[in-house]
Regions:
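Outer-membrane beta-barrel translocator domains and adjoining extracellular loop/strand segments
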Residues: 25-30, 54-56, 79-85, 112-119, ...
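Residues that define the transmembrane beta-barrel architecture of outer-membrane proteins
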Residues: 1, 24-28, 35-37, 49-54, ...
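Detector for outer-membrane/organellar transmembrane beta-barrel domains
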Residues: 59-159
Length: 222
């Protein structure tokens, strides 16, 4: 169940309730956001599976840039203790034909040593989608160029695990054919130490396990 409310100028309140079959695993949360002339603010809290979590964030424009900071602090109901936080600090350059974005992510669920990646994969919080990263410290970036005709778009995105080190690059080219049809071609290229399987399976880096691939896609919108 989801309820959205707009109690006043610039305010938005978003509440969600998820019934997972038992009161023990019941999940619910509420988030309030406020748009001000100088910043967008949000804060909230709730229960997610067996954690109680508080969160807050702010984004503010600085010239042609936008600075973002958000974080979440979980409390484990079973261990009766706080877990490490999850924090993201980012900067975006918007406007014109070029868009740039970069961010640092502190992943409290992640490991500081590749030897512990298997443990992260077995963590229920990873299985529940609370994080998609195995490492503790990560960098992400994106650069996009769209010429004035808006029919062509070139994008390069990347992720970097600062501890392995390992990473990925994702170049993409999109052409707007017209008539609500788009054609895209791109690749996913990873680098880092590859896993070993003998005598025991072991991950030596995060993104080195991903492999590489090339893709093409035709999208039609109705």
């Amino acid at each position: 169940v989801r309820v959205l409310s707009y109690p006043g100028d610039g305010w938005e309140v978003d509440a969600v309730l998820a019934d997972r079959g038992s009161s023990r695993n019941l999940s619910a949360g509420i988030r309030a956001s406020k748009s001000l002339p100088w910043a967008d603010l949000h804060m909230g809290g709730g229960k997610f599976w067996r954690e109680v979590m508080g969160l807050a964030g702010v984004s503010t424009p600085v010239g042609n840039y936008k600075i973002r900071l958000e974080g979440a602090l979980p409390y484990d109901l079973d261990a009766e203790d706080f877990r490490l936080p999850r924090i993201t600090l980012g900067v975006d350059r918007l406007g014109g034909e070029t868009m740039l974005s970069a961010e640092y992510n502190f992943n409290g669920i992640g490991a500081t040593d590749a030897e512990d990646y298997i443990r992260v994969l077995q963590d229920p919080r990873f299985a529940q989608g609370e994080t998609y990263f195995l490492g503790r410290h990560n960098l992400g970036g994106l650069a996009s160029w769209t010429p004035g005709n808006d029919r062509i778009s070139l994008t390069v995105s990347g992720l970097l695990n600062l501890q392995d080190p390992s990473g990925t690059l994702g170049p993409n080219f999109t052409y707007d054919i017209g008539q609500s049809t788009r054609f895209s071609v791109g690749a996913f290229v990873s680098f880092g130490d590859k896993p070993v399987f003998e005598p025991d399976p072991r991950l030596k880096s995060e993104f080195g396990t991903y492999g590489d691939f090339v893709y093409s896609m035709l999208s039609v919108y109705f």
